């Protein structure tokens, strides 16, 4: 079988038919409208200053510290998300490039505005871990234990109020119904 010569017209048509790659998110701090109150900004400045290691107290942190400051202020961004808003710096620049408070504030506003709310599926998936029999039920006692000991811990009375009337005769809870109950307010 003889080899075919490549047809430039066909190759060009194939290339044109390829879907356009969506542009990657680029963060522009100047485009972010700051919506924090003056008192909040002062609190943020205070937290930011605790990470400032400059000898003169110049209100600067390294790029590597940005995620730590965000987490100290109650956010939970991944390292990838932090690197993305910092413009994907090279690893060797993380400990040398500096970020001042005026540049950090729009980054903080971005994470505050875009704080992810968990979806129904996220919560159900998280509770499915405790569904040992795969029947859509979790032990009420185990769920109580998790709610008072892990993450943002709840008090016993908060848990009782939350779970009131949801346990069946065997002490089990349908976790999909539980999530619907919570998300409905």
Curated annotation (Swiss-Prot):
Record domain EF-hand: where: 39-76, 118-153, 153-185
Disordered: annotated span: 1-20
Other noteworthy facts: Light chain 23 is expressed in chicken embryonic skeletal, cardiac, smooth muscles and in brain continuously from embryo to adult.
Cross-referenced SUPFAM superfamilies: EF-hand (SSF47473)
Biased composition (Basic and acidic residues): 1-13
Source organism superkingdom: Eukaryota
Native organism taxonomy: Eukaryota, Metazoa, Chordata, Craniata, Vertebrata
Gene Ontology terms, MF aspect: actin monomer binding; calcium ion binding
Cysteines joined through disulfide linkages: none
InterPro entries associated with the record: CALM/Myosin/TropC-like, EF-hand-dom_pair, EF_hand_dom
Subunit structure as annotated in this protein's UniProt entry: Myosin is a hexamer of 2 heavy chains and 4 light chains.
Any single GO CC term annotated in Swiss-Prot or TrEMBL for this entry: myosin II complex
GO terms (BP aspect): cardiac muscle contraction
Entry keyword set: Motor protein, Muscle protein, Myosin, Repeat
Name the record gives this protein: Myosin light chain, embryonic
Gene3D superfamilies, A to Z: EF-hand (1.10.238.10)
